[in-house]
């Protein structure tokens, strides 16, 4: 049985997948399957990752646990392509938790194309279950921000740590994840969702001149606590404005707002690129990206036509295990 206590290699997956054709066929013919949305071939799907356009083809990766529709197994990156966002080709998993850097899961991340190569950044999760001090929040756990370079989007290269636990500020716990890259005037910015040791969500910002060597620069936060963790940050420029989208966890409902277990909101950002510093502009409660109950962990990218495209997970942490499709071997979609 695959679980988050053991590494999973491509060979492990392929041996297991060889016996799943009947199950995959049954899932494909399920009457509850959607017509125009990405859904898992088997098991569980969540966050979109590594969204990028190469030529006339869009590449979409996503978090994938094919082993357990209720998501109790290890997380891989699955790969799909499309030219029209109507028909998709499932290329299969390409990133596996097969090393000491990501043995408990290849968590969310992004892709950035530079000089003909694709730079993937993702969080390698390592849970030290055998340690007496393992508590998931403060100790016994590593979240490594891993860099992989590839020329072929189906064949990822060697894994190396770009930013690791030794690079996090002293007041940050073990929850640091979901790297996303922005370039501005020749400098690269990596944003990471984070949780402080006193349970305040924020976004850490690192800078680099070459996509290889990263230094901590600053953080983005509110003056008052707004959730205990900010996941899946996405910092981008849109129509001359700088926008931060992120997913705060632990925010209390406010009337009709924030009724999900965890939220997805956006902030206008005032940037001093020279310092650098990034401050949340305006006051009041941040607006939700989507007011529905099934939109979380979105990621955006700019395509060749200059459009800012966003894909989200049609689901939400701590809210999806009761889906009726779990008993049929699959769950969730991208939207």
Q: Over which residues does each language-model region extend?
A:
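Beta-rich carbohydrate-recognition and catalytic domains
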Residues: 1-178, 183-228, 239-291, 312-335
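Repeated scaffold domains used in trafficking and secretory/extracellular systems
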Residues: 231-233, 296
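Anionic-ligand-binding alpha/beta catalytic cores of soluble enzymes and soluble regulatory domains
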Residues: 300
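Structural secondary-structure packing elements that flank or coincide with functional cores
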Residues: 303-304
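Short, well-structured beta-strand segments enriched in hydrophobic/aromatic residues
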Residues: 308-309
